[in-house]
């Protein structure tokens, strides 16, 4: 992810006010000019529903490339976390994740964005919120389901 304009920022914003502790983050990026590369970092905390820069806009003639980012939910409650690209007030959502207590988000150039459980395991499942009632076809009425069979594949 590269920020190449003086109006480009990578931001974090939460979906609600925190309960006890703001989320903490650590960011590492390279700043490029036409002749140099300077490794840089940013450490901080969120500010509830107010956006905070993970990587601030580069100054004129420079570019910033995100190398690594770690965001940790150190609050006592679950929270929605949005990472967004701010191009001079034009927002593009990069990632939205609901983090449970002690879960984390990590970004690396090699792996992209990943979410980890409180135990450090990669969170790979997703859930679909279903409506409170589902209309089933008429042919699937009472008595239509007569047997449940479990099949194991050896492939």
Placement of each model-derived feature along the sequence:
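Surface-exposed, low-hydrophobicity beta-strand/loop segments enriched in small/polar/acidic residues
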Residues: 1-155
């Amino acid at each position: 992810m590269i920020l190449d304009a003086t109006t480009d920022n990578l931001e974090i914003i939460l979906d609600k006010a925190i309960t006890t502790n703001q989320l903490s983050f650590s960011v590492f990026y390279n700043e490029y000019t036409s002749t140099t590369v300077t490794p840089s970092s940013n450490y901080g905390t969120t500010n509830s529903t107010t956006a905070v820069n993970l990587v601030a806009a580069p100054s004129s003639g420079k570019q910033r490339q995100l190398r690594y980012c770690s965001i940790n939910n150190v609050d006592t409650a679950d929270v929605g976390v949005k990472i967004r690209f701010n191009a001079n007030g034009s927002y593009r959502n990069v990632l939205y994740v609901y983090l449970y207590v002690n879960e984390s988000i990590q970004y690396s150039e090699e792996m992209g964005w990943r979410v980890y459980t409180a135990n450090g395991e990669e969170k790979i499942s997703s859930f679909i919120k279903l409506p409170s009632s589902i209309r089933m076809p008429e042919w699937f009425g009472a008595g239509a389901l007569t047997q449940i069979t479990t099949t194991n594949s050896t492939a």
